[in-house]
Swiss-Prot record:
Taxonomic classification: Viruses, Monodnaviria, Shotokuvirae, Cressdnaviricota, Arfiviricetes
Binding-site residues, ATP: G165, P166, P167, G168, C169, G170, K171, S172
UniProt-listed PROSITE patterns: CRESS_DNA_REP
Motif Nuclear localization signal mapped to chain: 4-13, 60-80
Job of this protein: Essential for the replication of viral ssDNA. The closed circular ssDNA genome is first converted to a superhelical dsDNA. Rep and/or Rep' binds a specific hairpin at the genome origin of replication. Introduces an endonucleolytic nick within the conserved sequence 5'-AGTATTAC-3' in the intergenic region of the genome, thereby initiating the rolling circle replication (RCR). Following cleavage, binds covalently to the 5'-phosphate of DNA as a tyrosyl ester. The cleavage gives rise to a free 3'-OH that serves as a primer for the cellular DNA polymerase.
Domain of life: Viruses
Domain notes: There are 3 rolling circle replication (RCR) motifs. RCR-2 is probably involved in metal coordination. RCR-3 is required for phosphodiester bond cleavage for initiation of RCR.
Motif placement: RCR-1: 13-16
Residue ranges of the motif RCR-2: 51-53
GO annotation terms (biological process): DNA replication
The protein, known as: Replication-associated protein
């Protein structure tokens, strides 16, 4: 029998007869964030009617009205059986067009959910918040799994903002007020605690990272940074560098500053009490090319 609206449910199955190309593409485009597990197979009924047979196990309860907004023509019912039962039923004809997450074993829902979150590339802080008990028991193992498979290598140009000016003018405050999660890199080799934050802040910088390392950090190619006992992918979208000194003075004369300047996206200067973006033609070398 079709489900009544009720208070919502996490586990739903559905049938969608004669699916259109648009409906099939929509199903294929679904992402992992909302689901513990999902599977959709393409089948033909006894009368030859093509249809989609699907199963959704959401992380949060969903009402029928919300599901109808996703697939208005589908017939939804509250699911019976386990994830494994529904996996078998929806894949019986072998033409599976969507699978998300992993099938949970009985009594291990939280653990399997945490593993699935790590496998999908979620940040460890997010995994710890969503599965705190699992993290307390298996945090080291989840971290090791994340190091092996969790993060995809960088495939984009990390933006680099340089802001310099006299002490006490507000550079650090400006960096802290920028949007996104932040990792403050301390002096030294290690990046312990780095979890792919949106922004890396190099505060009060004057060349205390090796020049070749700075070039790699500020570039667009895959790069790993060291944590105790391992290396992790550097995936931050933005680097903010604050300094009392202009960037052309950070490194010795035998380090050509031009490659580093080329990686800068924007350069800022505190003029008295006003922050101004420096015009590229006023800088010692060209930037952002």
């Amino acid at each position: 029998m079709p489900s009544k609206e009720g208070s919502g449910c996490r586990r739903w199955c559905f049938t969608l007869n004669n699916p259109t190309d648009g409906e099939i593409e929509f199903v294929r485009s679904l992402g992992p964030d909302e689901f513990y597990y999902a599977i959709v197979g393409r089948e033909k009924g006894e009368q030859g009617t093509p249809h989609l047979q699907g199963y959704f196990h959401f992380k949060n309860k969903k009402r029928l009205s919300a599901l109808k907004k996703l697939l208005p023509r589908a017939h939804f019912e509250r699911a019976k059986g386990s994830d494994a039962d529904n996996e078998k039923y929806c894949s019986k004809e072998g033409d599976v067009i969507l699978t998300l997450g992993i099938v949970a074993r009985d009594g291990h829902r939280a653990f399997d959910g945490a593993v699935a979150a790590v496998m999908s590339g979620r940040k460890m802080k997010e995994v710890a918040r969503e599965f705190p008990e699992v993290y307390v028991r298996h945090g080291r193992g989840l971290h090791n799994l994340s190091l092996l498979v969790g993060s995809s290598p960088r495939d984009f140009k990390t933006e680099v903002d340089v802001i310099y000016g006299p002490p006490g003018c507000g550079k650090s405050r400006w960096a802290n007020e920028q949007p996104g999660t932040k990792y403050y890199k301390m002096r030294g080799e290690w990046w312990d605690g780095y979890d792919g934050e949106d922004v890396v802040v190099l505060d009060d910088f004057y060349g205390w990272l090796p020049y070749c390392e700075m070039l790699r950090l500020c570039d667009r190619y895959p790069h790993k940074v060291p944590v105790k006992g391992a290396f992790v992918e550097f995936t931050s979208k933005r680097i903010i560098i604050t300094s009392n000194k202009p960037p052309e003075t950070w490194y010795k004369e035998d380090c050509d500053p031009k490659p580093l300047f080329r990686r800068f996206t924007r350069v800022w200067w505190y003029n008295v009490d006003k922050l101004e973006q420096v015009r590229p033609d006023f800088l010692a070398h060209p930037i952002n090319y």
